[in-house]
Amino acid sequence: MARKDTNKQYSLRKLKTGTASVAVAVAVLGAGFANQTEVKAAEIKKPQADSAWNWPKEYNALLKENEELKVEREKYLSYADDKEKDPQYRALMGENQDLRKREGQYQDKIEELEKERKEKQERQEQLERQYQIEADKHYQEQQKKHQQEQQQLEAEKQKLAKDKQISDASRQGLSRDLEASRAAKKELEAEHQKLKEEKQISDASRQGLSRDLEASREAKKKVEADLAALTAEHQKLKEDKQISDASRQGLSRDLEASREAKKKVEADLAEANSKLQALEKLNKELEEGKKLSEKEKAELQARLEAEAKALKEQLAKQAEELAKLKGNQTPNAKVAPQANRSRSAMTQQKRTLPSTGETANPFFTAAAATVMVSAGMLALKRKEEN
């Protein structure tokens, strides 16, 4: 379109130089005339509006002015003819034609560049549309992915809230269980401490009872040794009786007294064995039960005291009988010298008891019984102290 307009605009190139010059001059003059006509017409419009009856005068003025313009036009045409004859003007016209030709070439180049620009612009717009489509698609995918992630996060949030509620409830239950466990642990520790103390007391009591039992066993052994010595003495007395008929009466009394003493000693030994068995039973009960009530302690103490009192009375009676027996045996010393020798032999066989330091008599001594009774009393006393 631009090239067609250019061709139309510059179609006067085919005209001759003079004709073109005249046309240019006419165009210039016509333009000037038109401008003047327009100015004059603008100036005339107001008077016509003011007075419609004065138009002949104005018409005559216009005719006059038209004539003047024609004269001016002729002057310009003459000036144009003079210019065509001027070599400098012709050179300028040739240069003008070259410039117009180059302008046409440039215009063609501009059209090609414009076409390329439009093609590039179309490609750019296509790429932009494609990029926009891809961007919209990517945005939709990201939006969808974001919504899915949001839904997933919301589900996880709800799950975490439920888990937190469950965890809080479980933690509260565990706290209660832990508190109960701690309380039970404290009770068990207190009970364990109590049992430990009771065990220490029981061990101490058992050790004391063991020592008492050992002392009782030692006393029993000593009593059995005394009994064996008495049995040997009795046998020796029987032999002495066969040897000395002269001292038969005295020996008979001594033998009878010895038999009575032996029976008493055997009875006392049996009673001491029963006491020892009772002490062993008591020790066993203490080991199994580990504790006695106050009532049982009182009963046991009263029983032991009663038995000790009875045993002491019995031992006192035996001591009196032994004293009487010794007194009765003194006058018969001259009649039976062999019996005296036998008694002196018995005296030489006397031993010292390691527990009390007393001299062992041929009969049951008070020291042995006292040891057994003291062992029972000591065991009871230690248990009460514990």
Swiss-Prot record:
Disulfide bonds: none annotated. Residues 1-41 form the signal peptide. Its main location: secreted. It is a peptidoglycan-anchor. Residues 42-152 are annotated as: IgA-binding. D repeats lie at residues 302-307, 308-313, 316-321, 323-328. The modification Pentaglycyl murein peptidoglycan amidated threonine is found at T356. Residues 79-221, 233-268, 323-360 are annotated as: Disordered. It holds the Pfam family YSIRK_signal. C repeats lie at residues 158-192, 193-227, 235-269. It is found in: Secreted, Cell wall. One of its GO terms (cellular component) is extracellular region. Residues 79-88, 97-128, 134-166, 174-201, 209-221, 233-243, 251-267 have a biased composition (Basic and acidic residues). Keywords: Cell wall, Peptidoglycan-anchor, Receptor, Repeat, Secreted, Signal. Residues 339-359 have a biased composition (Polar residues). InterPro entries: LPXTG_anchor (IPR019931), M_anchor (IPR019950), M_repeat (IPR003345), SMCR (IPR049896), SMDRR (IPR049895), YSIRK_signal_dom (IPR005877). Residues 357-386 form a propeptide. A motif (LPXTG sorting signal) lies at residues 353-357. Binds IgA of both subclasses, and also binds polyclonal IgG weakly. Belongs to the M protein family. This is IgA receptor.
